């Protein structure tokens, strides 16, 4: 579980084509999280190649690549980050696409409410941590199973 007193901060990648939103997000959350921003889906992909993130938050309406298209494009290579979608438009088709194609965890409307967004980030991180714990446990079980199968084969051969 994440310890807020530890040195590690939750790492958030925030993607928005409006520079003022990037500045505002970073100013609001930089004390609580390690915030990296990107002004486009293309730049966000570059950031993902440089470092890993717990959470990705993206605006939906951006030129060249929508938030859903961005999330869908990174799904295979970067499956672990929890995805949140922000949009100022009540576009139900975008939300449906985000859930089905972009595998979003949560949808929020703009302008965002600081408390609501902060809670969404915290909840998303708890989900990320739980998934990582499950992966580790599954790996341990696989290793134990492999060892038991090996011992059983050895016993059957003797």
Name each model-derived stretch:
Residues 1-13, 136, 140-158:
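Non-catalytic signal-transmission and effector/linker regions of two-component phosphorelay proteins
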Residues 7-20, 24-29, 56-57:
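Conserved acidic segment of CheY-like receiver
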Residues 37-46, 67:
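Helix N-cap/capping motif at the beta->alpha junctions
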Residues 49-51, 73-80, 101-102:
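Conserved phosphotransfer cores of two-component systems
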Residues 62:
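Receiver (REC) domain active-site loop signature in two-component systems and cognate sites
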Residues 69, 90-107:
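Alpha4 helix (beta4-alpha4-beta5 surface) of REC/receiver domains from two-component response regulators
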Residues 93, 112-121, 125:
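C-terminal output helix
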């Amino acid at each position: 579980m994440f310890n807020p007193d530890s040195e590690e901060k939750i790492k958030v990648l925030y993607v928005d084509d409006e520079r003022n939103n990037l500045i505002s997000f970073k100013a609001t959350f930089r004390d609580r999280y390690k915030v990296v921003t990107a002004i486009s889906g293309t730049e966000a992909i570059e950031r993902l190649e440089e470092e890993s993130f717990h959470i990705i938050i993206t605006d939906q309406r951006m030129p060249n690549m929508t938030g859903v298209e961005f999330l869908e494009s990174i799904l295979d290579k970067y499956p672990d980050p929890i995805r949140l979608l922000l949009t100022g438009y009540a576009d139900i088709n975008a939300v449906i696409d985000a859930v089905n194609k972009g595998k979003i965890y949560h949808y929020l409307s703009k302008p965002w409410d600081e408390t609501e967004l902060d809670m969404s980030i915290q909840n998303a991180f708890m989900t990320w941590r739980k998934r990582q714990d499950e992966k580790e446990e599954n790996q341990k079980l696989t290793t134990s199973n492999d060892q038991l199968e090996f011992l059983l084969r050895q016993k059957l051969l003797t």
